């Protein structure tokens, strides 16, 4: 089986300066309520928790998630030019879609979720993670690494320049490659190819049943971020 989907995303929500002047210090709480109400977040996750710290860019962070599964609403009430940020982590996005389908609307998709978020104001996708899963398709990370090393598979960047095998980070154990990293995480695009079955079996995950039932599972994850990688939404 080959499956394609959106794994997680980060959305930048721009400050409406006219509305900010009208509501002043209450503006961000107003937007937070709109965000929560639009997605029925309190019905699904409960009330958000204000974290006791910021992250260097935003000084106020609300988390609708739980444990290591996060859904953040971030803003900086001292630097308006930082705008606001909505972050759906992968596990939380899956849990949100599942709960929303059960409780609110069975037809919700990631695209419809993004369309609902676009009603909050001017928005831009600042990060989008795309996942392609090869389950029982016989796709091996170790085999792919060997083919890259032998130049049977050529890897190129956005400028179509060839990326040499030496610049592809290969990680594994027992003489077997289990993860490939292409480009840097800080770059506008980043590619990770890894043994998803092994990862799921090593930690708590909603994918545990799938991992236990399949023979092999390789995932390709593409991170797109920064200015030119992900465009403004026009939904």
Locate predicted features.
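Structured, helix-rich domain cores that form ligand/interaction pockets
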Residues: 1-235
């Amino acid at each position: 089986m080959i499956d394609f989907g959106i794994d997680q995303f980060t959305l930048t929500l721009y400050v409406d300066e006219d509305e900010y002047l009208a509501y002043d210090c209450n503006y961000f709480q107003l937007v937070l309520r709109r965000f929560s109400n639009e997605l029925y977040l309190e019905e699904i996750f409960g009330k958000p928790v204000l974290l006791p710290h910021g992250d260097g860019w935003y000084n106020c962070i609300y988390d609708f998630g739980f444990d290591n599964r996060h859904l953040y609403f971030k803003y900086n009430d001292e630097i308006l030019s930082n705008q606001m940020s909505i972050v759906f982590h992968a596990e939380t996005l899956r849990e949100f879609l599942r709960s929303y389908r059960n409780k609110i609307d069975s037809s919700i998709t990631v695209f419809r979720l993004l369309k609902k978020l676009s009603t909050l104001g001017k928005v831009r996708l600042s990060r989008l993670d795309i996942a392609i899963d090869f389950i029982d398709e016989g796709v091996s990370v170790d085999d792919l690494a060997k083919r890259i090393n032998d130049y049977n598979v050529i890897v190129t960047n956005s400028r179509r320049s060839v990326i040499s095998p030496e610049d592809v980070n290969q990680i594994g154990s027992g003489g077997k490659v289990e993860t490939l990293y292409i480009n840097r995480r800080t770059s506008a695009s980043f590619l990770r190819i890894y043994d998803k079955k092994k990862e799921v079996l090593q930690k708590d995950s909603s994918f545990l049943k799938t991992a236990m039932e399949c023979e092999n599972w390789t995932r390709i994850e593409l991170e797109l971020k920064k200015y030119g990688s992900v465009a403004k939404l026009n939904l």
